[in-house]
């Protein structure tokens, strides 16, 4: 494993640890507390989201825990395999490693939340509309970096063409 990839996996471990330690501290010491952060927009207001995903919660879809665990596990595997594929096809790239660290950390935190917390301990309330946690920030950082990279035409991302889905599918099938 290349040094850059080792740093990426260390970053994943650190990001997941930070997310989970924050949740443990909040659950044990601050769960019943409400504090303004930037009133009237942001508040610290911990709550458990037992709907397992934002989409399931907002649309009241009723999709259960084990279905969510399976979906997140499959997505995590696909994210991992796609990262390995990009490294094999294009070599290591700093922005790809950073993006992977955030999206894979978000996926791992989501999986941990569903398995061990029976949902997500969210704690930042936005405008009395929705509540989020650090894992959601990780996923949004990934999304922002992806958009920025596409906008700035990152050289590795520019090499990715219309055949990537077909090539990635072949890569996965060879792994099986």
Go through each PLM region and give its residues.
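Alpha-helical transmembrane bundles and membrane-interface segments of multipass inner-membrane proteins
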Residues: 1-176
């Amino acid at each position: 494993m290349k040094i850059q990839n080792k740093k990426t996996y260390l970053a994943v471990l650190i990001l997941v640890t930070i997310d989970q330690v924050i949740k443990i501290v909040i659950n044990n010491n601050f769960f019943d507390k409400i504090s303004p952060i930037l009133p009237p927009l942001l508040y610290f207001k911990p709550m458990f989201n037992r709907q397992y995903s934002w989409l399931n919660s907002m649309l009241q879809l009723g999709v259960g825990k084990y279905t969510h665990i399976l979906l997140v596990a499959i997505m995590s595997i696909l994210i991992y395999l796609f990262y390995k594929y990009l490294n094999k096809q294009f070599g290591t790239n700093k922005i790809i490693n950073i993006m992977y660290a955030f999206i894979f950390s978000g996926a791992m935190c989501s999986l941990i939340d569903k398995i061990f917390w029976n949902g997500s301990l969210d704690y930042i309330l936005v405008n009395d509309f929705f509540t989020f946690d650090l894992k959601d920030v990780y996923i949004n950082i990934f999304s922002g970096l992806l958009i920025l990279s596409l906008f700035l035409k990152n050289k590795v991302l520019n090499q990715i063409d219309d055949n990537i889905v077909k090539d990635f599918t072949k890569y996965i099938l060879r792994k099986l």
